[in-house]
């Protein structure tokens, strides 16, 4: 059968540069859709020969949206290879900074990147289907969203002197103690931001209730789930063991990040620079899994803060206690995690050790290699470093959140295209739904390929004879 080809390049309101190609049959139905990551990966090679103590300042330059995640993962890998476990007060301060990262990133994505599609509508005029349109539609909600992100950034800057590329965590701990004035400033703002997170949760729950048909047909498919948990299988974002659960929610493995290569392999497709991680024992594609908010909430049994845990139980009831497979519920899970991060930040600020000056372990016992792991807002982030006797890096491997989710995004793009895109004249709103299949995962493509890219969007539609029949531009 003759086919048409539609190209969406780049996908907008995500971080980084990707495109989607939709191959259509002559009858206007979709044959297949592909998610291409076309930034070239190279950052790991740049790091070879550098001192491991430099990595917590080098790797955040991969990304301006989640620099704290790379900053902390690099420091944690440095702890391991230098044999210098961080003292408890330093771990508390690192985790507090990480909660700020989660708050600002989740808040920004829900309200400003993913939210416009939901609050304004997938078919809304693309010229204002963004934060500008949100300001016009609901200025009060938009102001709350901005203040929520500002609070997350304030946590980071209170600790690291600046919110972008902070200078704080180092192998063995952190480089300066916290102070009571900073603690008090942050504590005074938490109650307001908890209320904003509750508003966000109610917004997405109401939207899902009013759009249940879309929720139930928009990229719903089974996978495994992957992420950090506590020893009791509670949600963990800073440090813990990696838990991998199956499509039915049962536990498949629990292992230390130091041993991830024993359990995870990577599949390659010719149409993407980004590899596809999977669970070795099940093979490809049966071993594909999801990470990030939806993956983490399916992967944990409970949350150790009261408000977020109460919401988690409602979330888990959506599919009768089985894993929640609906891609659009990523937004709901994201706001539950935002609420947890706010509650957890309050717990950390109340800990007496948060003001301790015991913040750095200067002992050294070099190891040949080590892994740092953290739950970045978008999912599990692994930094694996190999060093020589001088502490110089001989090899670097970064497995980032968006890489873990590559299968899920590719599958979602294919399913959404087949469900919503109909020819012969393809509407902009149809293609925006395909973009949202990626956007819901909140991908950071500069992280996944360790590069940066941006360009205008143009969609070209070719008929079954290969002639250009339609052009859509943003």
Which role does the model predict for each range below?
Residues 1-378, 400-474:
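Active-site bordering "gate/hinge" segments
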Residues 378, 383-385, 395:
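A translation/RNA-centric and nucleic-acid-associated enzymatic feature enriched
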Residues 394-396, 400:
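Active-site/pore-lining binding-face segments in mid-to-C-terminal subdomains
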């Amino acid at each position: 059968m003759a086919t048409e080809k539609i190209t969406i390049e780049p996908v907008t309101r995500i971080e980084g540069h990707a495109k989607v190609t939709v191959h259509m049959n002559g009858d206007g139905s979709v044959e297949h859709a592909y998610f291409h990551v076309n930034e070239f990966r190279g950052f790991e090679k740049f790091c070879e020969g550098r001192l491991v103590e430099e990595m917590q300042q080098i790797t955040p330059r991969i990304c301006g949206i989640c620099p704290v995640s790379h900053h902390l993962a690099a420091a944690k890998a440095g702890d391991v290879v230098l044999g210098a476990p961080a003292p408890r007060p330093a771990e508390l301060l690192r985790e507090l900074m990480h909660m700020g990262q989660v708050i600002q990133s989740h808040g920004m994505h829900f309200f400003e990147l993913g939210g416009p599609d939901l609050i304004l509508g997938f078919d809304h005029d693309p010229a204002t289907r963004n934060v500008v349109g949100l300001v016009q539609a609901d200025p009060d909600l938009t102001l709350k969203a901005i203040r929520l992100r500002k609070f997350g950034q304030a946590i980071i800057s209170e600790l690291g002197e600046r919110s972008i590329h902070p200078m704080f965590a180092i192998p063995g701990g952190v480089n300066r103690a916290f102070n009571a004035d900073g603690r008090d400033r942050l504590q005074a703002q938490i109650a307001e931001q908890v209320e904003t997170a509750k508003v966000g949760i109610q917004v997405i729950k109401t939207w899902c209730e009013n759009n249940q048909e879309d929720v139930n047909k928009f990229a719903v498919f089974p996978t495994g789930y992957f992420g950090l948990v506590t020893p009791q299988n509670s949600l963990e974002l800073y440090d813990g063991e990696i838990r991998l659960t199956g499509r039915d929610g049962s536990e498949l493995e629990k292992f230390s990040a130091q041993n991830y290569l024993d359990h995870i392999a990577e599949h390659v497709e010719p149409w993407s620079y980004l590899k596809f991680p999977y669970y070795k024992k099940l093979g490809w594609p049966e071993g594909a899994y999801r990470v990030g908010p939806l993956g983490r909430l399916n992967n944990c049994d409970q949350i150790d803060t009261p408000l977020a845990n109460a919401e988690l139980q409602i979330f888990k009831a959506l599919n009768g206690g089985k894993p929640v497979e609906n891609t659009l519920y990523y937004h709901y899970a994201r706001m539950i995690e935002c609420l947890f991060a706010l509650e957890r930040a309050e717990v950390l600020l109340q800990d007496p050790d948060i003001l301790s000056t015991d913040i750095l372990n200067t002992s050294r016992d070099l190891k040949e290699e080590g892994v740092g792991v953290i739950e970045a807002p978008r999912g599990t982030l692994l930094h694996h470093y190999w060093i020589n006797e001088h502490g110089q890096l001989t090899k670097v491997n970064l497995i980032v959140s968006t890489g873990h989710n590559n299968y899920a995004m590719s599958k979602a793009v294919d399913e959404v295209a087949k469900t919503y895109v109909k020819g012969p004249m393809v509407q902009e709103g149809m293609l925006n739904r395909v973009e949202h299949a990626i956007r819901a995962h909140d991908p950071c493509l500069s992280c996944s390929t360790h590069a940066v890219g941006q360009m205008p969007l143009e969609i070209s539609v070719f008929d079954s004879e290969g002639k250009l029949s339609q052009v859509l531009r943003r």
